[in-house]
Amino acid sequence: MLLFILLLLLSCHVLWLWRNRRFFNLYRKVGSRFPFVPFMGHGYLYLTNGEKVLNNLFKIGDHAISNGGMSTTWLLHRFYLMLADPVDAGYVLKHHLEKDELMLLIRYFTRTSSVFAKVAIWRPRRKIVSALLSHKNVSKFEPVFAKNSEVLVEQLRPLIGKEAFSIWEHLNAYTVDITGSTIFGIDVNSQTNLMEPLRLAINGIMELAAEVLLQIWYHVEFLLKRSSIYKQLLEYDHVVKCYVDKALKKHTDAASRRIKNDIEVPDDDHQISLLHLFAQLKEQRGIDHTTLYDESLGLLMAASDTTAVGASTAAAMLAHWPDVQEKAYQELYEVFGDTDRHMTIEDLPRLKYMEAVIKEALRLYPPAPHVTRKALEDIVLPSGLSVPKGTNFLISAYALNRNPKYWGPDADEFRPERFLDGSLPDQSLTIYFSFSYGPRGCPGIQFAMMSMKTSLGTLLRRYRLLPATVPNTSRGSAGPTAPLRFLFGVVVKEADNFPVRIEARHGK
């Protein structure tokens, strides 16, 4: 009996190898950081906690850097070719737009939002979303960013000189408030109430999505839809839907009275919202209620979560690198002096060092460190590697942003000056992948950068950021080399929730 079982398993494995021989040949040609296990592939790397899963992916990225810009991994039966060279990665992201089946699992959480949707759904919507998030439209939101940044610093005032706290909790509330205002045109007020239902629902959805990706059995739709996770998802979805429906009714009623021919932002600033613009397009371009809801949900989740993690990462890095923080503060002082005036859209281009700090923090720790694509046909990469149809690509922004071939020998160091001193390669070669790249790259880069510069700038004008614990002076002023520990997710989270301390500047 035992012999029969062993022979059956061996036969199944041989059959599997035969059916996947093209992928397995590519796996052997490229190589991998970890040994292959029959029936599991590298699945054992992902049957653990979120921190170890992410670290294993980072190790595969490190192997790709040292292996000519590529490595491989198997998630059970799914084969992935990881890319860490910008030429190959840029080619895939520009010409191969379909995401893999694993990312399509996220559709249970984002519905048909174009962020994770199939190309057939994404393509007709991309121009609309890009137009809504244009610089012209997003610039109108700066008063919202400035107003909520002032609320942020006031909410932090009681924490001056106290023990460490999670800066992410407050920046997450800030981003939920600004996305509520800019997307829905409603005041959420989660900064003054950290238990606000919309904020909890958004964060809950993202946590559930991460759990589904980590637990392989949830990759089976039948099991997922009968799980407690799915029941909880429906409860969170109902909370978000109530907010969206309320805002949709407000804006569709207004749009029905005044249909415009072009995408315009109203002159009255308090009316500005992306949903208002969506509603104007509802009848003009055949956008139905479901599309409005799904796109609003996707924008809300993407804008609030990624921006909060990005701003929190930059804040934590500033706390650990006081010399960098002082340079950023001096730049702010040159722009604002001793005044307490709000930040304006005209101020943002002058904050070049602050922008470099944010870019450098996100270079080292991109909020979405991996992007997937799927080859729908046989292709040849610019490097000359032949890739068979059906191959899943794992584009590692983490490895791409740390590849010393392009970033230099100090690629793992936190040095914002690299974006200002002309040391980077010619801009014709894209080497910065923190916001992805190509047609399906992040359409909200302007929104994210403006909101982060505003919140961090306002924060530094009032407070000095300090590490959660008193740093070891033997490390010098640069602080520890790896102060942050991240957990796997659709958008990564810091294991300790970005703890910092603050002290007032000049009695402010």
Give the predicted meaning of each segment.
Residues 365, 395-423:
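Conserved cytochrome P450 K-helix/beta-meander segment immediately N-terminal to the heme-binding cysteine loop
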Residues 44-68, 342-383, 496, 505:
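Conserved cytochrome P450 K-helix E-x-x-R motif and the immediately C-terminal K′/meander segment
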Residues 134-136, 236-310, 344-346, 418:
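Conserved cytochrome P450 catalytic core segment spanning the I/J/K helices
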Residues 131, 302, 421-455, 483-487:
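Cytochrome P450 heme-thiolate "Cys pocket" and heme-binding signature region
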Residues 322-324, 393, 445-491:
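Cytochrome P450 heme-binding "Cys pocket" and the immediately downstream C-terminal segment
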